Amino acid sequence: MTREEILSHVDHTLLKPEATWPQIQVICDEAIANHTASVCINTCYVKQAVEYMAGRIPVCCVVGFPLGAMDTASKAFEAKTAIENGAAEVDMVINIGRLKNKEYDAVREDIRAVKQAVGDKILKVIIETCLLTEEEKEKMCDIVCEAGADYIK
């Protein structure tokens, strides 16, 4: 694979809590220059980034980040607002505690609700593999597919 082919699959990301708009502009410019798949940012900058990018590179954002330990309605609201502000893709973090408790229906519903909120836009599910057993990783692959998400990360 060439450098360009690899970069075309990369989400250029800045998710630090202290990220500023000038820093977001820098990664937007880098994403444009390098033809990345998207620029992935916190939801508070989605509207500005969409305007700044002017359709050149899709804007992606994260919901329930970084912990995933928030209620489903809040994640869905955050996702819906991001889409209304122009996000083309949403990455969500699962509720790892619910997975560890084997509350599979709750985890599935969490993903389903966010997918419903984003509609036909892309939903990627962050499962934090470093925190999961092999069995939990396998279970999450099934749950993510059943819930209708587009990607698992």
Protein language model features and the residues they cover:
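Alpha/beta enzyme core
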Residues: 1-34, 38, 44-153
